[in-house]
Amino acid sequence: MADRKRRPLTTRNSARLKTKRQREELARNPVFEPKSKYRSIHPIRVGLSTSSVYPMTVRECFETASRLGYDGVEVMITNNEETQDAGLMARFAEATGLPVLSVHAPTLLLMPRVMTKDHWEKLRLTAELAKEAGARTVVLHPPFRWQGEYALGFVDGVRQVAQETGVRLAVENMYPWRAGLREIQVYYPDWNPLDEDYDDLTFDFSHASTAGMNALETVGEIFDKLRHVHLTDGAGSLKDEHLVPGEGTMPVAETLQYLAKYNWQGDVVVEVNTRFVRKQSSREKMLADSIAFAREHLGLDEDVPRRYSHSHTRTSEHKPARSERDDES
């Protein structure tokens, strides 16, 4: 493995400034086409993550997804045994007619010993569980920089596990942690997957908002590797908000329209925070609004003729309008 230059632990906090500039750029040069309807020539499934209904059970997530018209479920693996039981997931899938679209590996900060404390074995177990449950994608976060050899060999190791198991391991974009005027770079090789040699990626709108990323530009850059989208929103807060799509300031509608227009192939999974909601009816409205948003902007809400656009290529002709790159210094 080639030597990597270790990035500094802290950098200047620029997320809010970037977010502000991006909003101003979109206001000056809107890219959303309100009168146009696009639908990818490939089927795009809209799923519901179990994290969107927490603390409800996996069974309740399947039932809610079925009731609201979702196409499938993403299961976040936690300490809860039912999230680690592929047979149970398969039974829920059979009972509701909804497949397990994806499994989220327990790679979060508070899950170091879920399944096993061995990081590579954890990914292998997750991939095997996903395959047994009928899912074709595992979502995972990049390592923390203190996770030793796992972090140093992450890019090549993820590819090896994917090849061994036949399951796609789609690495998710994250964000720098914040401390006053500084950003702490806790992820390795980076919270931003753009410059890493991954085969498969997941894009999360809330993480992008917290990081100050340009969602449209990023999706254009990673289009060929993008397998999975976490549908949510953010308002540029330093916290990972996971708002209902359309309730933040990210160009979520524009990005979904872009994916449909250029015939993207993958799954979109709603991952919104409903933990603060006390009434089940309020939670269901948030989840119903989320799938309605997805179906509208992916062209799935009605009989929309498929528009055969040119295949996506990495040219200025097909990329969304972008703002000038921000000066990092």
Identify the meaning behind each predicted range.
Residues T165-V171, D199-F203:
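Short, structured loop/turn "capping" segments at alpha-beta junctions
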